[in-house]
């Protein structure tokens, strides 16, 4: 990587960090209001409206308000009792808390985030929810701070598109999954016909648009990391030629 591109990647990562830190602080500051925190995203394409009401209503209001995703990966990951699940870019913890319920006391749900403010919010939300089978880790999704072959399921919600090194994300995801483990991700994906420049015209990087991979690029990236059984299924449009999609993949058995 050239010095110029390395600098640009660092700038993008810092922009993303600042955006999510600000979102966490807005939710935390709103928590003291009599009517509860305002959601940081509230439309039909991003945010808490993509979760079923019966799921939202049983979570801390701050976890729901901090939702910035483009789907509900816990609904498609087919989590089972006793499994160990990792959420890449866990934010305020909504998907970690939902996962913790699905895997039960014999399982464990990990959340990984690079933003101190989001981690603090997630820990507070876990305490309010009374969740004892959760753990939040500080770090980047390009260098996951967990041992190899220890996770059953990796989920993520509209975060991989924000990474400046997606091959590293796919390689690290493959590394931490046990043989036979699986991926269940919600992410923004672009039509194959859209160039990188056309994606940038439709939205910025921090808005989960400019950094989106195409369907073909996403599949190729997962295949290069060693994944099989890849499915990329669009669920709803988020911009012209860009979609929220469910991404599933398997790490082959040893």
Language model features by range: what are they?
Residues 115-117:
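Conserved SAM/SAH-binding beta-strand->alpha-helix loop
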Residues 167-182:
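A short glycine-rich, Lys/Arg-flanked "PGG" loop and its adjoining helix->strand segment in the class I
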Residues 190-209:
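Short, glycine-/aromatic-enriched active-site segment of Class I SAM-dependent methyltransferases
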Residues 81, 142-153:
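A short acidic, Gly/Pro-enriched loop at the edge of an enzyme's catalytic core
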Residues 129-142:
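Conserved SAM-binding strand-loop segment of SAM-dependent methyltransferases
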Residues 35-84, 95-98, 102:
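Conserved alpha-helix/loop element of class I SAM-dependent methyltransferases that forms part
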């Amino acid at each position: 990587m050239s010095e110029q591109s390395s600098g640009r990647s660092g700038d993008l990562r810092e922009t993303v960090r600042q955006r999510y830190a600000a979102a966490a602080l807005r939710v935390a500051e709103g928590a003291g209001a009599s009517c509860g925190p305002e959601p940081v995203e509230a439309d039909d394409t991003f945010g808490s409206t993509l979760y079923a009401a019966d799921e939202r209503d049983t979570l801390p209001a701050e976890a729901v308000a901090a939702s910035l995703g483009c789907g509900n990966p816990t609904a498609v990951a087919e989590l089972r009792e006793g499994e160990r699940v990792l959420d890449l870019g866990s934010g305020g913890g909504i998907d970690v808390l939902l996962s913790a319920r699905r895997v039960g006391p014999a399982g464990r749900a990990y959340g990984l985030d690079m933003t101190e403010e989001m981690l603090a919010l997630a820990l507070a939300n876990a305490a309010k929810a009374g969740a004892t089978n959760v753990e939040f880790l500080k770090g980047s999704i390009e260098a996951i701070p967990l041992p190899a072959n220890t996770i059953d399921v990796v989920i993520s919600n509209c975060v991989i598109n924000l990474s400046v090194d997606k091959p590293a994300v796919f390689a690290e995801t493959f590394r931490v999954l046990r043989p036979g483990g699986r991926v269940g991700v919600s992410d923004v994906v672009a039509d194959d016909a859209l160039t990188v420049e056309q994606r940038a015209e439709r939205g910025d990087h921090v808005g989960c648009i400019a950094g989106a991979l195409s369907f073909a690029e996403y599949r190729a990236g997962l295949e290069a990391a060693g994944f099989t059984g890849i499915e990329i299924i669009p669920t709803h449009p988020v911009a012209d030629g860009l979609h929220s999609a469910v991404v599933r993949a398997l790490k082959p058995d040893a």
